[in-house]
């Protein structure tokens, strides 16, 4: 049976087109997906991301568990509220999921994981946690909103009680804090996002969600669907699990080597394989592509390089660049001239370093 967020009726009242996304009925757009995309780049938009899975980890051995569970080093988290992006790997070095972990107390950490991997992630985390006597708690009582764009932080901060505004305004990137709403309910506000823009992601009690959503709409924040969320994240060079990487792909094959910490004395799951890949290299790589000709890059299209064939992982029309962009997995080595097979034509594309766009600005290498 398809799941619905607390905002389902609200989305429908706003004219949203609803689609099945990982078993959840979610808004794909409220009208023009391109207009929604531009509004986030230029102003502020709000996303219902309550389909995401929130998992709290409790116990005195949470940090040792996470040193084992995550490819990135949780030892970087020393200040309560700080967050870290990491992959969770299987013994073969494949990505079970990518996630954000928050350090709240030494005996209390929080995960935000993908909706599509909920059951798999919970099973894997519970299995690993049992040896550390860590309690795993799914927080289905919480909803999640993302407010993104250059005006997003100001719009959210203005709705808070004055006693909290200063702390929220000073919140650093990849950090979170808890504040009280006007009805004295706890809001968990983090300066994170999936768009390449500044902004906040907010966890809050289900019953508070509609009130906050409507309050933000009254300030001029626009509702944004998952369609624009996808084009925004692709412009920002952010991976989508299940499309850009999965359990058959290691972080080094998904342009996520920067999230791997081979720190001394930490035997995380999959480390042996990643050490070999670090030393010997990998046979595949993920690259960014930009197409100057008219057309759109799509998942699954064949990519031809000097080193052999690959395929498009994520592809879309970029509203900011007014060109087609994409990620591709291709054989390792210098790709040289690259072409994409579109309707039996080998169309030339350029290899570019991503992100393509960050905080509204086209990155300098894109049109070199």
From Swiss-Prot:
<dbReference type="GO" id="GO:0005960">
    <property type="term" value="C:glycine cleavage complex"/>
</dbReference>
<dbReference type="InterPro" id="IPR006222">
    <property type="entry name" value="GCV_T_N"/>
</dbReference>
<dbReference type="InterPro" id="IPR028896">
    <property type="entry name" value="GcvT/YgfZ/DmdA"/>
</dbReference>
<dbReference type="InterPro" id="IPR029043">
    <property type="entry name" value="GcvT/YgfZ_C"/>
</dbReference>
<comment type="subunit">
    <text>The glycine cleavage system is composed of four proteins: P, T, L and H.</text>
</comment>
<keyword id="KW-0032">Aminotransferase</keyword>
<dbReference type="InterPro" id="IPR013977">
    <property type="entry name" value="GCST_C"/>
</dbReference>
<dbReference type="InterPro" id="IPR006223">
    <property type="entry name" value="GCS_T"/>
</dbReference>
<dbReference type="GO" id="GO:0008483">
    <property type="term" value="F:transaminase activity"/>
</dbReference>
<protein>
    <recommendedName>
        <fullName>Aminomethyltransferase</fullName>
        <ecNumber>2.1.2.10</ecNumber>
    </recommendedName>
</protein>
<dbReference type="InterPro" id="IPR022903">
    <property type="entry name" value="GCS_T_bac"/>
</dbReference>
<dbReference type="GO" id="GO:0019464">
    <property type="term" value="P:glycine decarboxylation via glycine cleavage system"/>
</dbReference>
<dbReference type="InterPro" id="IPR027266">
    <property type="entry name" value="TrmE/GcvT_dom1"/>
</dbReference>
<keyword id="KW-0808">Transferase</keyword>
<dbReference type="GO" id="GO:0004047">
    <property type="term" value="F:aminomethyltransferase activity"/>
</dbReference>
<comment type="function">
    <text>The glycine cleavage system catalyzes the degradation of glycine.</text>
</comment>
<dbReference type="Pfam" id="PF01571">
    <property type="entry name" value="GCV_T"/>
</dbReference>
<dbReference type="GO" id="GO:0005829">
    <property type="term" value="C:cytosol"/>
</dbReference>
<comment type="similarity">
    <text>Belongs to the GcvT family.</text>
</comment>
<dbReference type="Pfam" id="PF08669">
    <property type="entry name" value="GCV_T_C"/>
</dbReference>
């Amino acid at each position: 049976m398809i799941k619905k967020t607390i905002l389902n009726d609200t989305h429908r009242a706003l004219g949203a087109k609803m689609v099945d996304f990982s078993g959840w009925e979610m808004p794909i757009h409220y009208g023009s997906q391109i207009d929604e995309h531009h509004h986030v780049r230029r102003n502020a938009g709000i996303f219902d991301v309550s389909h995401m899975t929130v998992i709290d980890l409790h116990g005195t051995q949470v940090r040792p568990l996470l040193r084992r569970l995550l490819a990135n080093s949780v030892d970087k988290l020393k200040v309560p509220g700080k967050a870290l992006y990491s992959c969770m790997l299987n013994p073969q070095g494949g990505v079970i999921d990518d996630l954000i972990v928050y350090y709240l107390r030494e005996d209390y950490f929080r995960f935000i994981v993908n909706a599509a991997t909920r059951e798999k992630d919970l099973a894997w985390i519970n299995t690993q946690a049992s040896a550390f006597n860590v309690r795993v708690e799914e927080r289905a009582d919480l909803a999640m909103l993302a407010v993104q764009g250059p005006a997003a932080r100001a719009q959210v901060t203005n709705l808070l009680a004055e006693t909290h505004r200063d702390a929220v305004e000073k919140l650093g990137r990849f950090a979170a804090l808890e504040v009280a709403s006007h009805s004295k309910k706890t809001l968990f506000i983090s300066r994170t996002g999936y768009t390449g823009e500044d902004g906040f992601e907010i966890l809050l009690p289900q019953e508070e969600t509609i009130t906050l959503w409507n309050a933000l709409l009254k300030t001029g924040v626009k509702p944004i669907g998952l369609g624009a969320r996808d084009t925004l994240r692709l412009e920002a060079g952010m991976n989508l699990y299940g499309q850009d990487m999965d359990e058959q792909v290691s972080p080094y094959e998904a342009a996520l080597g920067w999230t791997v910490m081979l720190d001394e004395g930490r035997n995380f799951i999959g480390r042996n394989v990643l050490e070999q890949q670090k030393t010997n290299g990998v046979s595949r790589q993920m690259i960014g592509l930009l197409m100057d000709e008219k057309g759109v890059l799509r998942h699954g299209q064949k990519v031809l390089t000097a080193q052999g064939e690959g395929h498009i992982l994520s592809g879309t029309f970029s509203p900011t660049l007014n060109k087609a962009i994409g990620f591709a997995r291709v054989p390792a080595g210098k790709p040289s001239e690259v072409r994409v097979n579109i309707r039996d034509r080998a169309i030339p594309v350029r290899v570019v370093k991503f992100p393509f766009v960050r905080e509204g600005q086209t990155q300098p290498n894109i049109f070199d």
